[in-house]
Amino acid sequence: MAVQGIWSGTISFSLVAIPVQLVKAVAIGRVSFRLLHDKDYSPLARRMFCPEQEKMVPPDEIIRGYEIGPDRYLPITDEELESVSPERSRTIEIVEFIDMNEVDPIYYDHPYYLVPLKGGEKAYRLLVEVMRRTNKAGLAKFVLAEREYLVAVKSTEGALTLITLHYSDEVLSDEDIAPKEGKIAAEVKSGIKKSIKNMMADFNPGKYADERRDKVMDLLKKKVKEKAPVAAPEVEKAEGEGPADLIAALEEIMREVKKNR
């Protein structure tokens, strides 16, 4: 299966530079649905509605706002955001190596694979092997899609994996969650230890499946055999019709609804 790259550049540290491509390591297996109109099966479209003026808002009148209190916002323009946005990274520059065992999994965000590009295969394999033997990971800052990430680059099954990490101020404290220490009977401790020992097994994710997703897919396959899928009607677009005309039409509908309340 061909995997589409979402970024290409180099991974570097000291005098080493390896050309790589970033690809997704996880394909989310959720079953997604579109919302349809039950009368004609047309896919429903999302529109922006202003409750104050009771009208649809065209794209050129939509801005961002940062909420600073109940019903209080600080407007901000695209130009202002662009002025503080970091430049897109061309290099994943490792600033230090760490022991991966020291990284609490709660800091893990999204995993990606780093695929070697032409000319970088030998250095790539060498880095994979060294990091595997030492169980070390490279720590770096990396900009993707106008967001600056903290990332860990590690060796996984013969390949380099890049894991985006949460920043420390994003991880919530467990101080209010952990129960206070108390006296636990020796037989209770012994029983828990025995249960854990009896249930020990090697990690094998292939033993488990998303049963709900599988049942939904079976349901869909059954429905396809029993009943042909419906087709949404073609929407004829009149000459000159565009977003402004659509908004005007929707506003007219809203006015009619208000009259009939």
Curated annotation (Swiss-Prot):
Gene3D superfamilies: 2.40.290.10. Keywords: DNA damage, DNA recombination, DNA repair, DNA-binding. Residues 12-171 form the Ku domain. It comes from the Bacteria. One of its GO terms (biological process) is DNA recombination. Pfam families: Ku. InterPro entries: Ku70/Ku80_beta-barrel_dom, Prok_Ku, SPOC-like_C_dom_sf. One of its GO terms (molecular function) is double-stranded DNA binding. Transmembrane segments: none annotated. SUPFAM superfamilies: SPOC domain-like (SSF100939). SMART domains: Ku78. HAMAP family: Prokaryotic_Ku. Belongs to the prokaryotic Ku family. Homodimer. Interacts with LigD. With LigD forms a non-homologous end joining (NHEJ) DNA repair enzyme, which repairs dsDNA breaks with reduced fidelity. Binds linear dsDNA with 5'- and 3'- overhangs but not closed circular dsDNA nor ssDNA. Recruits and stimulates the ligase activity of LigD. This is Non-homologous end joining protein Ku 1. It comes from Geotalea uraniireducens (strain Rf4) (Geobacter uraniireducens). The lineage of its organism: Bacteria, Pseudomonadati, Thermodesulfobacteriota, Desulfuromonadia, Geobacterales.
